A protein has these predicted regions:
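N-terminal Sec/SRP start-transfer signal
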Residues: 1-23
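Short hydrophobic, aromatic-rich alpha-helical segments embedded in or entering the lipid bilayer
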Residues: 343-364
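Secretory targeting signals
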Residues: 28-83, 133-214, 235-314, 318, ...
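Junction motif at the cytosolic side of a transmembrane helix
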Residues: 5-7, 11, 310-314, 381-403
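Short helix-to-coil transition segments within interhelical loops
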Residues: 224-230
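Central hydrophobic cores of alpha-helical transmembrane segments
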Residues: 22-25, 319-332, 350-351
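Hydrophobic transmembrane alpha-helix segments characteristic of membrane transport
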Residues: 214-221
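Residues that define the loop-to-transmembrane-helix transition and helix capping
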Residues: 18, 231, 318-320
């Protein structure tokens, strides 16, 4: 335990570590959460050409939007949808531009485009919500089921796979609860979902020197002469890397959640994620989806940390270690679109390469003839890969130290 605390303090004392943590905090929490809620994302529009033209009043806009959504009764039915669209059209006709900003018009417009494509007027430059006849917006859930079936057919997900996905979808409670959706859509679609991709960069910088730095700092001879030996020190380094990863994640996640609670409160936590993407099959509400996405980031970060520490133990050069570590995450992202679909899915199992937004999709894996919904594997396989790398990191470092 003493060795662990020594290694832990040694890591946190490094200037590069403090700089990385600070930069990531500023990017993910200050800009990606606080200023996004208050200014870039939800501030009232003053200049429609840029988010930077928004007013610094996001908190007020969010609260007004939540209050407005509650006026529609809390359940999403045909009548609710008709009333939302009718109310929007009336405000638009009255020239109430500022009032339109508190509506869920972007979300509702996506529903209309998905469920009522025959009502789209290609000659009209306006969005569907502005001109569609509210009285024709009927059969919401029947149409959703039809669209889902058509999507699965087009995707080649038929037979047993289609029935498997339908079994998952049947657990979704209907009618859907309805409150303000846009905030949760932004939160789950980018704020939390992109956290792991950003963390990977800074984790790579910090952990790449954990083992390789012993040669860079000319301390390898000192490690060989210590009474504890390489084995215990290697274990202490592994535990230090894991502890730093968890602490780093906790700092970002807790700060983001505090920001979220301040701006959004808990309103809408029990809405189904189908309000964001209608053809999603996951029986999850917004809170459950957020918990999954944070778990995805944490477990993916632990898995990535294991890979970085293995590379650091196997390579003496800090820069090469960093480049190889970053290539593990960003390399597959860059080449994925040029690969066959099955290979893309396989690459998604690499830590922090896949996306937590798979809960909105219908992807599956077939392993030994058994169908498995992709989010289950995306949250387990990456951390297992990292854990498996850790013993090899110790052995690799051992061989180099003895040599």
């Amino acid at each position: 335990m003493e060795l662990f605390w020594l290694e832990h303090k040694k890591l946190w004392r490094k200037k590069i570590v403090k700089i990385c943590v600070l930069l990531c905090f500023v990017y993910c929490v200050i800009f990606g959460s606080i200023l996004w809620f208050q200014w870039f994302g939800f501030g009232s529009s003053d200049d429609y050409t840029s988010a930077f033209g928004n007013n610094f009043d996001g908190y007020t806009v969010i609260k007004d939007s939540q209050e407005y959504a509650l006026s529609f009764g809390g359940e999403l039915t045909d009548e609710t949808l008709q009333k939302i669209v009718s109310d929007y059209q009336q405000m638009e006709a009255d020239g109430m531009e500022e009032e339109l900003e508190k509506t869920d018009w972007q979300i509702v417009n996506s529903w209309l485009g998905t469920l009522y494509p025959e009502l789209r007027d290609t000659s009209n430059y306006k969005t569907m919500i502005s001109y569609v006849d509210p009285d024709k917006l009927t059969g919401f859930y029947e149409r959703r089921q039809q669209v889902l079936d058509e999507f699965l057919e087009v995707s080649g997900q038929v037979g047993a796979e289609k029935e498997f996905l339908h079994q998952i979808e049947r657990k979704v409670e209907k009618p859907f609860r309805y409150e303000w959706v846009e905030g949760w859509s932004t939160l789950l679609g980018s704020m939390v979902a992109d956290l792991g991709v950003v963390m990977a960069l800074f984790l790579g910088i910090v952990l790449s020197s954990l083992f390789a730095g012993e040669w860079h700092d000319n301390t390898s001879a000192l490690v060989l002469t210590t009474r504890n030996g390489w084995g215990k020190i290697a274990l202490a380094k592994i535990l230090t890397g894991l502890a730093f990863t968890v602490e780093f994640f906790a700092l970002l996640a807790v700060s983001n959640v505090i920001s979220q609670l301040f701006f959004m409160g808990t309103a809408g936590w029990d809405m189904p994620i189908q309000n964001i993407k209608l053809i999603a099959v996951a029986p999850m509400n917004m809170l459950q989806a957020e918990i999954y996405e944070y778990a995805f980031v944490l477990l993916g970060a632990i898995g990535f940390a294991g890979i970085v520490m293995f590379i650091s133990a196997a390579v003496k050069n800090n820069v090469l270690t960093l480049l190889l570590s970053l290539a593990v995450v960003y390399g597959p992202m860059m080449i994925a679109e040029y690969l066959p679909y099955k290979m893309q899915k396989a690459l998604d199992l690499i830590p922090l390469v896949g996306s937590s937004t798979d809960i909105f999709r219908t992807n599956t894996f077939r392993i030994f003839g058994k169908l498995i919904w992709s989010p289950y594997l995306l949250i387990t396989i990456p951390v297992l890969i990292g854990i498996l790398c850790m013993p090899f990191a110790i052995k690799s470092w051992s061989r180099r130290m003895k040599a």
